[in-house]
A protein has these predicted regions:
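Amphipathic alpha-helical dimerization/coiled-coil segments
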Residues: 7-8, 97-123
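Beta-hairpin "wing" of winged helix-turn-helix
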Residues: 70-86, 91
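Accessory beta->alpha helical hairpin/"wing" motif in late/C-terminal subdomains of nucleic-acid enzymes
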Residues: 92-96
Length: 123
């Protein structure tokens, strides 16, 4: 693993404890961006970092492969115009868009409930 990378931690030092919880949010981010247009691994790493996730290529690429195998993403190979390197571009499938829609509905419900309880209990 490259120096400075962890397995999907947030920005805190305790975050590796929450890997199993946060990986679902990372997948939702991936589906969201891949629904808007084609995305590739390095761009996703940088975009996720803007949201506080530090994810290594060794974690992201197997996640993308699994999402493709489960039918949430399609990929195609392309050449990076600047460097001429091959890269994989990902886009959501119909199943991925349905999954994203379901995730958004659940997130709205969850954030409403968590926000209510936090306000009510002073947490």
């Amino acid at each position: 693993m490259e120096a400075g990378y962890y397995r999907i931690p947030m920005t805190t030092t305790d975050s590796t404890k929450f890997h199993d919880l946060l990986s679902g949010f990372v997948r939702i981010h991936i589906l969201h961006h891949a629904a808007e247009g084609e995305v590739y691994g390095q761009w996703l790493i940088e975009e996720l970092a803007r949201h506080g996730y530090r994810i290594s290529p060794g974690t992201l690429y197997p996640m993308l492969q699994a999402m493709e195998e489960r039918g949430y993403l399609n990929s195609r190979e392309d050449r990076d115009g600047r460097l001429g390197r091959r890269r994989k571009l990902y886009r959501t499938t119909a199943a991925g868009r349905r999954g994203l829609k379901a995730a958004r509905e659940r997130l709205r419900e969850l954030t409403g409930e968590v926000g209510q309880k936090a306000g009510r209990r002073g947490q």
